[in-house]
Amino acid sequence: MYKRQGQELSRNIPDSYRRGIELSASLNIARWFSLGANATLSQNRIENYTEYVSEYDADWNYLGEKELYLGTSTLSYSPSVIAGVLLDFHVKGFSALLHTQYVGKQYFTNGRNDALSLDDYCVTNLNLGYELAASKIGSVRFGVQINNLFNTEYCNNGYGYSSIVGGVREDSAFYFPQAMFNVLANVTVRF
């Protein structure tokens, strides 16, 4: 893939690796309550990485690409920590599911540039439901899904790029903010 001037937009990376460990556990504490947890701890690296940044003069005339050798860098969109906890309550027709997820810092380029990164975040969702047995149709379940229970401000995606204009590096970052506290209601009819 190429830009209008002919330089590459993306490149294959010959020396990279992902290594880590994934853990998960679940425990039924009582017939009506269970606890689950998971975590992924990883290293996501590029060896001998060179970043290529488009360079322009002060009048935005294209001068070429500047090579910036970074050595070992971090793969984009690859947090080193992802973890979650799940609490599941269910008594007769009532159910409650509380899920908290933590996602570590992510870069959205391979350049390990803090100006082009996503902050870590932790978000909690709650699902509540009640199911009634209905003799003629099977069952009816009423549910409420409460997303972002603690009203966390976070972005879970973004993109960006760097350029050098008139000898000064400029980093342009764009983010996708996620919804604050919100509620969805639902009804499920089973035949």
Give the ranges of each region predicted by the language model.
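Short, P/G- and charge-enriched loop/turn segments at secondary-structure junctions
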Residues: G71-T74, D114, E170-F174
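C-terminal beta-signal and adjacent terminal beta-strands/loops
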Residues: Y102-F108, Y130-F191
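Outer-envelope beta-barrel architecture signal
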Residues: R31-F33, V81, K92-F94, C122-T124, ...
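Gram-negative outer-membrane beta-barrel transporters
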Residues: L9-N110
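Conserved small/polar residues in nucleotide/adenosyl-binding loops
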Residues: M1-Q5
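Hydrophobic pocket-lining residues within nucleotide cofactor-binding pockets
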Residues: N44, N113, L149
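Short, surface-exposed loop/helix-turn segments at secondary-structure junctions
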Residues: N110-L116
